[in-house]
Amino acid sequence: MEEQTFISKKVGVLPARWGSVRFPGKPLAMILGKSLIQRTYENIIQSETLDKVVVATDDQRIMDHVLDFGGACLMTSPECANGTERMAETVSRYFPEAEIMVNIQGDEPCLRHTVVDALVRKLEEHPEIQMVTPVAQTTDSHEILTNQKVKCVFDKNGKALYFSRSPIPHILKKETPIYLHIGVYAFRRSALFSYIASAPSPLSQAEDLEQLRVLEHGGSIHVCVVEAKSPSVDYPEDISKVEEYLTCHSSASF
């Protein structure tokens, strides 16, 4: 039987796997009555720029759950090493005409669709840019010092110079701005498959940050500075932080 394909040009993909070492079954973790993946999906389908939003998984439990709440879900190989590889397989198999694709982490239940729209518009308005990702300024000392939050420095043209789990730049003056990286990436098709074809690189392995692989191979990543900064779910204990955030922002659409 021939596999279904879609004609969408701009696609949002939410990679979701069951076997997280830090939090097994994380996509189905409940947050105030809805699963993590459902909250993320329902935020992103409000996008004004994407033609299609899908969850990409290798687990039948996740697929069944997404279909149950009315979402779109596609099955991928369990061999994918990370979310970007899962998105690349999804695009290659199901979206042969996609020109812009956005990798949206399924652990961002409070991520607003406006962040995704800003990335897509950046690519639409600047044909020379191949890949773009959001950053948000922070003054929170815990966020700056913890290795669970990734920091980014970039040049005056908005091109990323480096990403690190360490505080960068080193702060000699209080007014030095620090930017947190938000784990969402918008690619042009050629940039996505160029990344997939590249070999793992020393700094990406040292920091455990796949985006450094792009920089080490001579590619470029532009940043889009956004106001929206919200908690993600990496560990089970993060659920209570997200619930508190949602309760405090109950007037917003989540």
Swiss-Prot record:
UniProt entry keywords in alphabetical sequence: Cytoplasm, Lipopolysaccharide biosynthesis, Nucleotidyltransferase, Transferase
GO CC terms: cytosol
Reaction catalysis annotation: 3-deoxy-alpha-D-manno-oct-2-ulosonate + CTP = CMP-3-deoxy-beta-D-manno-octulosonate + diphosphate
Gene3D superfamilies, per database record: Spore Coat Polysaccharide Biosynthesis Protein SpsA, Chain A
Domain of life: Bacteria
Pfam family, one: CTP_transf_3
GO MF terms, alphabetically ordered: 3-deoxy-manno-octulosonate cytidylyltransferase activity
UniProt record, GO biological process: CMP-keto-3-deoxy-D-manno-octulosonic acid biosynthetic process; lipopolysaccharide biosynthetic process
Keyword Coiled coil in annotation: no
HAMAP family given in the database record: KdsB (MF_00057)
Protein role: Activates KDO (a required 8-carbon sugar) for incorporation into bacterial lipopolysaccharide in Gram-negative bacteria.
Protein family (similarity comment): Belongs to the KdsB family.
Name of protein: 3-deoxy-manno-octulosonate cytidylyltransferase
Lineage: Bacteria, Pseudomonadati, Chlamydiota, Chlamydiia, Chlamydiales
